[in-house]
């Protein structure tokens, strides 16, 4: 109820007067008082999972070391409303320090924006193809988080979602998505993925990577600077559009550009070099003024790590 009140503050007084049946109906967790699959996924007890067979209400967190070896794991089940918090607390959100020119005092940021972690997990829950009977995976590596869910990416293109910045016309699990929206778990207004990109931009980190092959969605969030010139460019050029940054992100990741993308970046003198070995222009990534970020990142672990 607290989440629902936060989402709909104008109904706060009425919410306190609703009995449980009324509240669950209003939150779209039940339908005319009857239990739905969405209610079992989000609020059900762990032993209730068999009612939605062959679906699995499971999120697996897996920790890997720098060599790719498994170090630890945890599997959380129903209720997924609470499982998200349990998985989130497992992830080690280390501190990054960056040093500005003209000062000896470092500034610290979290390696990952909390919103990005939660949005990625909740998107997996909302868009998982539960008919395939698979788990949602959260894989934690030294400098990356990987989130996977089964099922195709219905909008077709991540760039399309970001560019349109509007609600999707169709969802795989419409009733579940509505319930999660009402509980403030996801943003069905179409801005969640875009916000993830913007948070990475603010850190000067690589943008989220989406792999839509093999009938699944795999999202990789990188928690470090990959290319110093990319970081310098973002720090110095606040006027760059998100579309331009997405293209520069492809350059730093050595991903191929099509002819239109190449021409666009060359015309604006954002890249140099010859195909396929493009790199970010030295001019746009030139040294920064004192007030801007010096691209010197130091990863540090917390005292309790």
Named regions from a protein language model:
Residues 14-20, 65, 70-72, 85, ...:
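Acidic-enriched, low-complexity/disordered segments with a strong bias for Aspartate over Glutamate
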Residues 1-134, 140, 148, 153-169, ...:
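Active-site helix-to-loop segments that bind/position phosphate- or nucleotide-bearing substrates
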Residues 37, 57, 157-159, 165-256, ...:
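Flexible, glycine-/charge-rich segments associated with ATP-binding catalytic modules
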Residues 51-52, 134-143, 207-220:
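Conserved C-terminal helix/linker of AAA+ ATPases
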Residues 145-150, 221:
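Conserved DxG motif in ATP/Mg2+-binding regions
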